[in-house]
Structure formats: C-alpha cells, structure tokens
UniProtKB/Swiss-Prot annotation:
Protein name in UniProt: Probable ribonuclease FAU-1
Organism superkingdom: Archaea
Organism: Pyrobaculum arsenaticum (strain DSM 13514 / JCM 11321 / PZ6)
InterPro entries named in the record: DUF402 (IPR007295), FomD-like_sf (IPR035930), Ntdp-like (IPR050212), RNA-bd_FAU-1 (IPR016730)
Top-level EC class: hydrolase
Length: 444
C-alpha cells in the first residue's frame, strides 16, 4: 500500500479515488480528514500530488512505483494528458560541462546550470537535478550534491533551510535541533522537509546520519554520465473539460458538487462556489459566461505543463463565441504568418464554446487583417481566465493561402495525449476563417 499526500483544488476527488484504489492517504488537511473520517497519520508520503501552476491539472512526484501506480489508475478513470519527466528530480549524476552554463548528463541529456555557478567547459563534476526535463523543456542541474531522505535533505550549499509548509513553532524546534544534534550536518548544508514537522528528533537525527554516510560515498564520484543516486519520478497531469467532469463525479460521491465544479475552481472561485455546490442547480455555462465578461488572461497550456499567459480585454460574446482583444508588443514576427509586428498591431481572439480550436486574427494599427492563426486544442474553458491545452497542431491563413503547422512537433509528443485527443487536424476548420469583433467569419 503506497502512502499519498494530496493537496490542492482536486484534493477531495483525488482523495476519494486514491482510497478506492488502495492508497493510504497521509498528512491530510483538516477538511479532508473530516470529510473522509480519516484517522491522523503523519507518515511521510511515497507520492505527493498537488496543483499545477495553471490549476488545470496536477503534478505528481515521489517513489517511481507509487507514481506509476497512481498515474495508471488516474489514466484509466479520467483519461487525462500525462507528461513524464525524462530524468528524476534530485537525481545525482556525474556530468561533463559542455558550455559555460550547460552540462551533459546520463544518456546525453543536456541540462542548464544556474548562472551563479562558474563552469569550465570539458570539466567533469557531480550534479543534482533541481528541475527535471520534460517535453522540449531542458532540465536544470546544479553542481551540488543533494541527498534527500523522508525528513531532511543534506546538500553542499552550506545553508540551513526549511520547507515553507513547516509552521513557525515547529521551525523553532528544528532550528534548535540543527544547532545541537545536527550541527555537523548543518555546516555542510541541511534542509528540513515538510514531514520533519511530524517526526521525533531521534528519527530525524538517525536519518541525517545515514544520509551523511551516503553523501560521503557519492562524493567519490564516477565516470561521466554515471547516475550516483536515483531521485524521484515527476509527472505533469493536465485535465481538459472531459477529465474535469469525471473528477466532478468523484467529488459528488463525497460532497454536494455542481457540474463544472473543478472548471470553476480553476477560475479561482472560493466561497461562492461552495455556496453553488450546496444550493445546487445547473449553472456552469451561465457562471462561466458571466466571468468571461471580465476576462483578464488567456492560459495557453502546453501538454508538458508550460503556460503561455496572454493578457486580454473582453470585446463581448457573439453568438456563442467569446471575443477578446490583445495588444501586441512591437518587434518579432507573427508565428506562421511571417509578418513583422509593428507599433499598434493587435489581435482579436475568438473562443467558440464547445469547439476544439481558438482563432487569432492579427490586425495593423489601422485595422487591416494581416493573417489568422488557428490553434487545435482541448475545448476552451471560459472565465476570467480562458484556459485550454494546446494539441500542438495549427493552421495559418493569409493572403498566400492555408498552411498546416507543427505536425512534426505533435508526432514527437503524441504519446502524452489520450487516444481521444490524437486527431488534432480533425478539430480545425476546413475553410479559411477570421476573428472579428462580430465573431468568427468565413473568408470567401
């Protein structure tokens, strides 16, 4: 039985599912413990699940067997988009510097190195993965040794630090421990993890001693590309509207839940959503349209979790299409269209309800359309944040005709998508279209 710590806006649904799947939920919040009648269990987790920054998904990290077991069950239930990191978080390896700020690790993977470190090209050293590579995003590795346990982490930074989730009164206890029994480790580098707040001093001290011995062994190094210590598996899981609907069903089995609960929670709604849950009623579309009247941003989420945030001003809703206006910064070239962005250029973005695409038409300062870019994506969710997940294939329309873009990128990352989302071209319009202030128009 794997131990899972679950946090965030999906916590009720995922806790319900995790318990059904045979996981033991540890360190629950008071609200979750009360809802499920859980007995206090402050054991360190095998897997931690928390919100992704976009609030349209989660990140899962921990013991690889536990992470894979959780992802397997979640995929079966909610059919989400899943991106797995190519290297493990806190993995320690022998790397060879291939530039002033890059290092080559196991399997030829190249990591960025923070600029505060000075590298000598060609030199080898010991590195730790501090941000794993995922999708096209490079990982980040630091020339430090980090040895992580359940309660503490020993490192070579020379600092003592504490998880942000450790309350002030517990931090005082741990600070005293660092200055007494753990003094020799604190001088090297020591970080107290969130589970340390629940652990007795003896358990923390015993773990620190074992980690120190392991650190000494690791410091002997090895050959370039060698992994000296395995880290934690890491994955990004994104929920489109269909996956969120399944999570709504799971939550509804525990507490009153309106349709669209998780989509509205991703919009940042708090107490008013709790009220809607208890009052009941099918109000999702009306609530989403109301929030869209003050739309402030477009969240264009890549399947590996990267979020492109674009500020937008609402123009209005036109026949089931939300129209937004975005200012463009001069300089650069419009993707897929090849027109240089001049001062005063702007974009009108049309977000049709229930469709698998978003339309961006670009205009000069005088209001002349210069081209349209259509993204294939999951069905967009309306609100103060317009949220959708990029399916990586696009179409561009301009005076030169129509072009399909980025098919090669989609094919490279197709395995991240569930089968139901693996035909992005079918979601795109077959004829040229434009986004105008009156909505989407077909070009004759």
């Amino acid at each position: 039985m794997y131990r899972a710590r679950i946090r965030g806006i999906y916590a009720t649904a995922l806790t319900k599912l995790a318990l059904d799947w045979g996981f033991k939920v540890v360190q629950p919040t008071e609200k979750i413990a009360r809802r499920f009648g859980l007995e206090p269990d402050f054991s360190p987790p095998d897997i931690t699940v928390k919100d992704h920054e976009s609030k349209t998904g989660i990140v899962a990290m921990g013991l690889c067997e536990a992470v894979e077991a959780f992802l397997s069950k979640l995929t079966e239930y909610a059919d989400p988009i899943v991106a797995r990191a190519r290297a493990r978080l806190k993995e320690v390896f022998v790397g060879r510097a291939v530039g002033e700020a890059t290092v080559e690790g196991p399997g030829g993977e190249v990591f960025d190195v923070p600029r505060r470190y000075v590298l000598t090209p060609g030199a080898t050293g010991i590195y730790t993965v501090v941000r794993p590579p995922i999708g096209p995003l490079k990982g980040v590795a630091a020339p430090e040794i980090v040895v992580e346990g359940q309660y503490v982490e020993l490192n070579t930074t020379g600092r003592v630090s504490y998880s942000e989730h450790i309350p002030a009164e517990e931090a005082v206890r741990l600070r005293i421990l660092a200055e007494t029994r753990l003094r020799q480790y604190a001088s090297i580098g020591l970080r107290f993890k969130s589970s340390a707040r629940y652990a007795p001093d003896d358990a923390i001290a015993a773990e620190a001693e074992a980690l120190y011995k392991e650190m000494l062994e690791i410091s002997k190094g090895g050959s370039p590309g060698q992994v000296l210590r395995r880290g934690k598996c890491f994955a990004v899981v994104l929920f489109d509207s269909a996956s969120k609907a399944r999570l709504d069903e799971a939550r509804a089995a525990v507490v009153p839940t309106v349709r669209g609960h998780h989509a509205l929670r991703a919009q940042g709604l708090g107490k008013c959503l709790d009220l809607l849950d208890h009052v009941g009623g099918d109000v999702y579309e009306k609530a989403a349209e109301f929030l869209a009247g003050e739309a402030a941003a477009v969240y264009h989420v890549k399947p590996w979790g990267e979020v492109v945030k674009m500020r937008a001003e609402p123009v209005g809703v036109r026949g089931g299409v939300l129209v937004l206006r975005r200012r463009l910064r001069p300089g650069g070239v419009l993707d897929g269209i090849g027109v240089k962005i001049e001062r005063g250029f702007y974009a009108l973005t049309c977000v049709p309800r229930g469709k698998g695409y978003v339309v961006h038409t670009y205009y000069t300062a005088e209001g002349k359309a210069v081209g349209t870019y259509v993204n294939a994506n999951t069905v967009p969710e309306w609100g103060r944040r317009v949220i959708y997940i990029d399916l990586l294939v696009d179409k561009a329309f301009d005076g030169g005709g129509e072009r399909v873009l980025d098919l090669d990128e989609y094919e490279k990352y197709a395995e991240m998508f569930p089968q139901r989302l693996r035909d992005p071209l079918s979601r795109l319009p077959k004829t040229p279209i434009w986004c105008t202030e009156e909505g989407i128009k077909t070009v004759a």
